[in-house]
Regions:
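Short, low-complexity N-terminal intrinsically disordered segments enriched in polar/charged residues
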Residues: 2, 21-49
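Bacterial N-terminal signal peptides
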Residues: 10-20
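Second-shell loop/turn segments in exported
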Residues: 25-28, 39-43, 56-63, 112-114
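Short solvent-exposed beta->alpha transition segments
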Residues: 35-37, 51-104
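Exposed beta-sheet edge and beta->alpha loop/turn motif
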Residues: 92-143
Length: 143
């Protein structure tokens, strides 16, 4: 009798476990993957690791701005802003076209950031899907 009860329970458990992949989290959206890439890249810039931020940028970014020039430019801008304090996500939008850039896959992301010398700045970070299949930053602007 005991064997008869365990067979239906085993069958039910087998069906539950077979259905689990369907219950798993959906794959990460391209926008969320781009946002994670942008936030990781911004963390490098916030930490003053400007050379490493260039190393992690998209090939398009690197082709437009030499490493040394990037390090000088971002050091100057961040020096004027003062120490980084906080950042709040505002919005993001996927697009395949941007002015002055080749067609591709881009996500334009905006953050409100606070710095010691500028309490409310808008940062626009634009990751793109790079040739290696990874989202990498191709543009960064602060207003």
């Amino acid at each position: 009798m005991q064997g008869r009860r365990s067979a239906p329970i085993s069958l039910v458990l087998g069906l539950v476990f077979a259905a689990m992949p369907a219950l798993a989290a959906p794959p990460e959206s391209r926008e969320e993957a781009a946002r994670k890439a942008a936030e990781s890249w911004l963390a490098l810039v916030d930490a003053g690791q400007y050379g490493q931020s260039w190393d992690e940028a998209a090939a398009l970014f690197k082709s437009k701005v030499p490493r040394e020039k990037w390090e000088q430019m971002v050091a100057s801008v961040r020096g004027d802003l003062g120490e980084f304090q906080s950042r709040e996500f505002l919005a993001m939008q996927y697009t395949k076209e941007l002015p002055g850039a080749p067609d591709g896959e881009y996500v334009v992301i905006q953050f409100r950031a606070a710095y010691a010398k500028k309490k409310s700045a808008i940062e626009t970070v634009t990751p793109m899907l790079d040739a290696d299949g990874r989202w990498r930053v191709s543009g960064y602007f602060v207003k």
